[in-house]
């Protein structure tokens, strides 16, 4: 088999038809999988010695949340080091990063694997990976044909990176896109709420405005603060963190503004406060709603005039600090109740951001679960950590009152439990490994079975033919995709189709 001009033209057209980078990348991956008839394909971005999935087809959804560090994935490291097409033999001793991550084939190892490194000039910017369950699945394609595919993908990714760079420098108009937020590697999520939040972060980061970040406990407000700082002109200077809820009243003022020697019992030397430490940088005040009214007044003065006084000192010090504040309270209600100053609230909330709770983020829970699974895999030295279909279903229907933090702890606990019940270094997380309160799962849909005047063999074969026809129609007559949907081996499916008279 070889690529025709029409095939290559179709791939190029799909890249142009997409609306936005994410859509173009998905069209590319989906088209490649159909053309190559492979079981799985992925486009990865290279950043800081790790590959970050941008688009996948044929892989479990949680792959989009995983971060593949080269140190833990020798096949990907081999692709990163290569300057050309990499073909891994079926008996390669290097584990495939997608083993167990092809739906319906969790217990099987990937047999055929091709890696295409993507370059912009001499710089590695990403990779295309193609995987199949048959050992010789890609033998029909020459290296030259695969290089053409890599060139198309590299061009699309390179253009996207260039546009991202220009937009971040305000050199061209346009709002941020989900792709541009990939550099915030820990802010995982493609739901509308997270996409909007990432856009707002891109907008406010370039300014010097104070930001009030609100959200329930465990939603990731600190990550939002880090993302703002890292994307701001102050990124070369420190980001200083202070948890206001953990401050005893007796030392809170000293922690914020510092003190001089002898200011109080135990002040044996001069000490800088958080504002001084954050000079020319950013100060993140977590749980700001816990500050006393007296300290709120002093904080307001700093925001108004840009100077501080150490405890026990009459002199003022000028500071240049951007303040990011976070709270899990409704500060408007706190203002009405007299527990928070209205003038401070307005100073802080020049650009308010709201972090959505996990229960409102849809499939983001699966992406985050994949990220935490990969973290556990590296930390515990496991070869793979995979979510079963039942585990994914459970995670999608649990409401997570503790949000992302609860999910992280649940994954870590489940991995430890699953590891204790299996021999070896491969872990599959099942629903029973999660200690959630009772979760009501939707019942499986019952299919109506018509009564026909056929014997059992004829009825069975008729049912098999119709099932295969429907699966083929849904997968554009891609037999590999059809086999995956039906959760059977593609070779067995071909044999069954021949026996049923559906193939020559």
Curated annotation (Swiss-Prot):
Boundaries of every Sigma-54 factor interaction domain copy: 187-416
Keyword terms of this UniProt record: ATP-binding, DNA-binding, Nucleotide-binding, Phosphoprotein, Transcription, Transcription regulation
One Pfam family from the record: GAF
DNA-binding region, residue range(s): 479-498
DNA-binding keyword on record: yes
InterPro entries, sorted: AAA+_ATPase, GAF, GAF-like_dom_sf, Homeodomain-like_sf, NorR, P-loop_NTPase, Sigma_54_int, Sigma_54_int_dom_ATP-bd_1
PANTHER family recorded: ANAEROBIC NITRIC OXIDE REDUCTASE TRANSCRIPTION REGULATOR NORR, TRANSCRIPTIONAL REGULATORY PROTEIN
UniProt cross-references to HAMAP family, sorted A to Z: NorR
Protein name listed in UniProt: Anaerobic nitric oxide reductase transcription regulator NorR
Species name: Escherichia coli (strain ATCC 8739 / DSM 1576 / NBRC 3972 / NCIMB 8545 / WDCM 00012 / Crooks)
């Amino acid at each position: 088999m070889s690529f025709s001009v029409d095939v290559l033209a179709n791939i190029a057209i799909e890249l142009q038809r997409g609306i936005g980078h994410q859509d173009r990348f998905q069209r590319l991956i989906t088209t490649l999988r159909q053309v190559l008839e492979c079981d799985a394909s992925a486009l990865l971005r290279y950043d800081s010695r790790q590959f970050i999935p941008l688009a996948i087809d044929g892989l479990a959804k949680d792959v989009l949340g995983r971060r593949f560090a080269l140190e833990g994935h020798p096949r990907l490291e081999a692709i990163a080091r290569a300057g050309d097409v990499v073909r891994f033999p079926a008996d390669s001793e290097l584990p495939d990063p997608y083993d167990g991550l092809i739906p319906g084939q969790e217990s099987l190892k990937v047999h055929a694997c091709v890696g295409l490194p993507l370059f912009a000039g001499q710089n590695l910017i990403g990779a295309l990976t193609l995987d199949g369950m048959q050992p010789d699945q890609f033998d029909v394609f020459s290296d030259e044909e695969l290089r053409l595919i890599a060139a198309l993908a590299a061009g699309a990714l390179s253009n996207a990176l260039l546009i991202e760079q220009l937009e971040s420098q305000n050199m061209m108009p346009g709002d941020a896109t989900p792709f541009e937020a990939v550099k915030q590697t820990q802010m995982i999520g493609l739901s509308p709420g997270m996409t909007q939040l990432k856009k707002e972060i891109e907008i406010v980061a370039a300014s010097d405005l104070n930001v009030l970040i609100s959200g329930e406990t465990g939603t990731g407000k600190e990550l939002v603060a880090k993302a703002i700082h890292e994307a701001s002109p102050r990124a070369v200077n420190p980001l200083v963190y202070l948890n206001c809820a953990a401050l005893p009243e007796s030392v809170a003022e000293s922690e914020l503004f510092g003190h001089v020697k002898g200011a109080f019992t135990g002040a044996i030397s001069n000490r800088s406060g958080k504002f001084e430490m954050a000079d020319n940088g950013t100060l993140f005040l977590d749980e700001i709603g816990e500050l006393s009214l007296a300290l709120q007044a002093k904080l307001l003065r700093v925001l108004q005039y840009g100077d501080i006084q150490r405890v026990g000192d009459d002199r003022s010090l000028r500071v240049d600090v951007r303040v990011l504040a976070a709270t899990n309270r409704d500060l408007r209600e706190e203002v009405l109740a007299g527990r928070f100053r209205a003038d401070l609230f307005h100073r802080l909330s020049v650009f308010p951001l709201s972090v959505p709770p996990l229960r409102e983020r849809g499939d983001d829970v699966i992406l985050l679960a994949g990220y935490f699974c990969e973290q556990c895999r590296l930390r515990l030295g496991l070869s793979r950590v995979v979510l079963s279909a039942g585990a994914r279903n459970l995670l999608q229907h649990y409401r997570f009152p503790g949000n992302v933090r609860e999910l992280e702890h649940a994954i870590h606990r489940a991995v430890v439990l699953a590891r204790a019940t299996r021999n070896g270094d491969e872990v599959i997380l099942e629903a029973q490994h999660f200690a959630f309160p009772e979760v009501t799962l939707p019942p499986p849909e019952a299919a109506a079975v018509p009564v026909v005047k056929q014997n059992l063999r004829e009825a069975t074969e008729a049912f098999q033919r119709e099932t295969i026809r429907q699966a083929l129609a849904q997968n554009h007559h891609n037999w590999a995709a059809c086999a995956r949907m039906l959760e059977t081996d593609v070779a067995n499916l071909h044999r069954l189709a021949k026996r049923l008279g559906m193939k020559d």
